Design a protein with these regions (language model features):
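C-terminal helix-loop subdomains that flank or include functional centers
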Residues: 39-45, 163-302
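Structured, contiguous alpha/beta core segments that scaffold functional sites
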Residues: 2-193, 197, 209
């Protein structure tokens, strides 16, 4: 379950995940000489594109034969970002047989070779929203820095304790409970920052659009449940559960669980740990928690 959770997180972040099946020697001391190695998609040599021997071809590090079947994956020995940590490491990719690599990604169109991160459709909107939020924060900080403005014709008189900045400009400060007498002609005008209305509503609208682009509900994306009731949150969760069930039964079970199970059984039978008879497996996905079990049961009965 831990490997599956890590794979799904990588699917969300990077759009795809590689699982390399490694067979081990008997002297490694493993009950079954088989291990799984999870690899980030950065291990795949995306610059490897062109023709391959035997009439095949390579697209972004994935090699196909003449019939379009996946034949090999061109992988770096280490993560490209960690080459500097290993003196002997090289950025020369090597082909790994496709039978030893599970390439997991959500296919959105026929002929798709690589996965797409979930947040790719909204990445520009997220950047713009972050810039707007930063600009709003800077505006608030600037407004908070100006407490009052002193007007008058006498520049020598000060109000309160006076200091100077690096350029010699006078800066005065206020203290709690301070009482100060003004000289004739002096006046103090306190800053009244203008309120930028609609900030919260604008953020909600943008986050709604981002949630729709990702394929989630606003509540699941933000964790804000202040505007929902039982019916609305249940309706939103129904669509989310349908998507998760499709991910479980159309991607994880056929693309990960079943191939790993078959390789595990074959390896165990090869070393005599299991009988040679066929062994089947049934898959059970984690159940979804009910928002309100009593209301859910009543709704199912009706």
């Amino acid at each position: 379950s831990g490997l599956q959770a890590l794979i799904v997180r990588t699917l969300v972040e990077s759009g795809e995940c590689l699982v390399r099946i490694r067979e081990r020697r008997a002297e490694d001391g493993l009950p079954v000489p088989l291990q799984l190695q999870l690899l980030e998609p950065d291990h795949l040599d995306a610059s490897k594109t062109g023709e391959a021997p035997g009439g095949g071809f390579i697209i972004q590090g994935v090699e196909f034969d003449a019939l379009g079947r996946r034949r090999a994956y061109w992988l770096y020995p280490v993560h490209p970002g960690e080459v500097a940590m290993f003196r002997r490491a090289s950025l020369t990719s090597q082909p790994v047989p496709a039978s030893s690599v599970l390439h997991l990604f959500d296919r959105l169109r026929p002929g798709q070779v690589r996965g797409v991160p979930w947040f790719a459709p909204v990445i520009l909107k997220l950047r713009d929203l972050d810039d707007y939020d930063d600009a709003e924060l800077v505006r608030k900080k600037i407004e908070a820095c100006f407490a009052a403005f002193v007007t008058g014709s006498d520049d020598e008189e000060t109000l309160g304790r006076a200091t100077s900045d690096a350029d010699g400009r006078r800066i005065e400060s206020f203290e709690p409970g301070m009482i100060e007498y003004l000289a004739p002609g002096k006046d103090v005008k306190f800053a009244t920052p203008s309120h930028a209305g609609g900030y919260g509503e604008y953020m909600r609208v943008q986050l709604h659009a981002i949630a729709a682009g990702v394929g989630l509900t606003y509540e699941l994306l933000t964790g804000d449940l202040s505007q929902v009731n039982y019916s609305s949150i249940r309706a939103g969760l129904i669509e989310f559960r349908r998507r998760m069930e499709a991910l479980q039964w159309q991607l994880l079970v056929p693309g990960l669980c079943r191939p790993v199970w078959q390789r595990f059984i074959a390896t165990s039978q090869a070393i005599g740990a299991l009988p040679a008879d066929p062994i089947d497996a049934e898959w059970t996905a984690p159940r979804f928690e009910a928002v309100d079990p009593l209301k859910d049961i009543q709704a199912d009965i009706l």
